[in-house]
Amino acid sequence: MSHPRWTGGRALAILLMAAVWVASGVGVYLYFGAHRTTLALQARKPAEVKPKTGPIAHLPGTLYLVQGGTLYRLERGNFTPVLNTPGGASAWTQPALKPDGQGLVVVRRDYGSSDLFQVDSSGHVLNQLTHNASRTVETNHWAFYPRLSADGSVLFFSYDRKDPVNLYNVVLSVYSMPAGGPFGQAKKWTIPAAYTGGDVQPIPLASGSVIYTKYSFDNKTNRILSQIYLTPRAGAPGRALTTIEDDCSQAAVSPDGQRLAMICTDGKQVASLEIAQFDGSNLRPPQVLVSAQLAAQPTWSPDGSSIVYLAPHGSGGHFQLWQVPAPAPPSVSPEPSPTKGSQTARATPRPTPTPAATPTPTPTSSALPQPVELTSDLDFDATSTIAWHA
């Protein structure tokens, strides 16, 4: 005699097991939901933030920053969208001001290419300077890090001219062309190291030389590291201003041309913001302004008295805008050093900065003021430069 497959007791047991599964699943979901990070909830769009008083409202002039592919203008503590994100995989990034501050050159990055555009201060597109998109993905091109000469007549940028034998070796070189185009008149300045990323972030100097960041393969560590380089003219071999061990990049020259700010990592996972005296050809031993932060994109104030940069709050999180006072150039400069030198040449790093809504009390003469966190709930693009004009 066969027994029935389903009995009341067996059905009740299965129902109880199902209830336990559902309850445990919901419980785990709620537990992890209560303990998950709130970073995504904290980030707000700059235009949604009410104008602030405090240090950010006292920044002189106008700043341009990028968040989420949208270009924002910051004036007196108020953020205004200038170029809204095109949407999809496209984004605006890396603004560079005209010398008179009445317009910009910006990068539009798309899925497989990027181009340079001229826009006015209200965000109206005036001219597309490059046309790098191709029907064939392998022949797309990239243009990044635009920077205009002091008189605004020449545009410098990084560009990847494809190797016809090896289209997948995407490596950037420094180029220049007339500010209004056409690209057919572009001139190649540097020869990058293959398979490294190349030469980026050119800064034209009044002397006609160009400072840039070069990525190279370090045989000692078997890693790709960066150095600050200087080249006197197009096609000339560049000369290193920093050692490869220091892994320095993102150079920014002060308005007076006598100081250079940079981001250095020493090949580690954290960075320091450093400043060095610059005579147009060489750097003096640097001084650490901010240490143990993931600092990025240092940018000088129009009067050279301070530097803004991007860094997350603490060891992780979204990138906020910070400001730190910059020491004035000394009246008597030490002998120049051909490279940034060993770590012993640096000033003693300050403690890791503590976020603050207002500046800390005036420190002793042997210490510099702590950096001030100007924003707290935004999420700026750390790979995009900052533009600042009086």
Model segments located where?
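Sequence signature of WD/YWTD-type beta-propeller architectures
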Residues: 3-390
